[in-house]
Amino acid sequence: MKRKFEAPQIAMDSAVCCTPRTMDADNRWNASVPSPERHREAGMVVRESNAFGAVAPATRGLAGMTGSVGKCNDMMMNSGSWVDVSRMTDARVKDNEQVFTSLIKTQVLDSSVEKKDKTERSIHIWRPALDGDEKETSKKDVDVEVSRAARIWRPNDPQPEAHSTTATTMTMGDQERNESSRYVDDFDSDGDDEHLDEHGSNAGDRPTKRKQRRYRTTFTSYQLEELERAFCKTHYPDVFTREELAMRVDLTEARVQVWFQNRRAKWRKREKLGLQPRLHPHPHFGPILGGPISDSNLVSSHLCRLACIDRAHRQGLLTSPPPPPFV
């Protein structure tokens, strides 16, 4: 509530006029204006008078009030003009808002610039390494791995176990094409299996960069007979049949597989040249030959014919006994 002053009206007007010069926007005393303590020394009592923060001095006497009014008038006259309280408050608020907005913009810009600098520094750290040394290193590693993978398997390298497992996964057509291309030059000689190594290549085949170790196997008559019997039954025995036959003839499964590969290649070459012996329907007749062949081929063909006749007798297709063995 407003307090009613007993001072004259001129004193009230003078006190209100002095108010803006004695208080700042935060209701703090301005150092350039005499503080309330100095007014008390002069015989004044300062109290709150209205809602605008104005102070109204209540005097004990007219002489003290007159002195204060005179001081206030002198100060206002020296300042040059009367100041509006509301206009000054609005200007200060706008200034504060502008300062606050500029501070926020500055902080946002600083943070964005800092993030951009960090990103550029991080890119600058790893990208030259990746584009330069790392790319060359990765390329060298790839070349090393490719050359290592190329040395894992070569057609002329001895692979007894790995070759047996890969052969079972190949189709019959792929085996025929591979074997025909691999063994077509190996039968220009007399065609004996003893002159072939494990992979059906002669010693004087293509020259290689490194010296290769070749293994040759000499088959006995019993082994050849059993192998020819199995070949007459099927040209492509599975891995179980090969293992059983290898145990029976005292050979390794890989060697039996290589023998079947060589035998199939020999069979195809004879059919291509028209030299393959054709079995006569009657068992007592010998093979009808389409041309001259060697003694070893004749023995193999006769053994194959005997195996076919024996199988026919077991199945009950023939009633007459088989002919005596070939001497």
Curated annotation (Swiss-Prot):
Residues 212-271 bind DNA. GO terms for biological process: regulation of transcription by RNA polymerase II. Pfam families: Homeodomain. The keyword Nucleus applies. The keyword Lipoprotein does not apply. GO terms for cellular component: nucleus. Residues 174-185 have a biased composition (Basic and acidic residues). Residues 186-195 have a biased composition (Acidic residues). Its main location: nucleus. Keywords: Developmental protein, DNA-binding, Homeobox, Nucleus, Transcription, Transcription regulation. GO terms for molecular function: DNA-binding transcription factor activity, RNA polymerase II-specific; RNA polymerase II transcription regulatory region sequence-specific DNA binding. It is found in: Nucleus. Residues 152-214 are annotated as: Disordered. Residues 162-172 have a biased composition (Polar residues). It comes from the Eukaryota. Belongs to the paired homeobox family. Bicoid subfamily. This is Aristaless homeobox protein. It comes from Strongylocentrotus purpuratus (Purple sea urchin). The lineage of its organism: Eukaryota, Metazoa, Echinodermata, Eleutherozoa, Echinozoa. The gene is ALX.
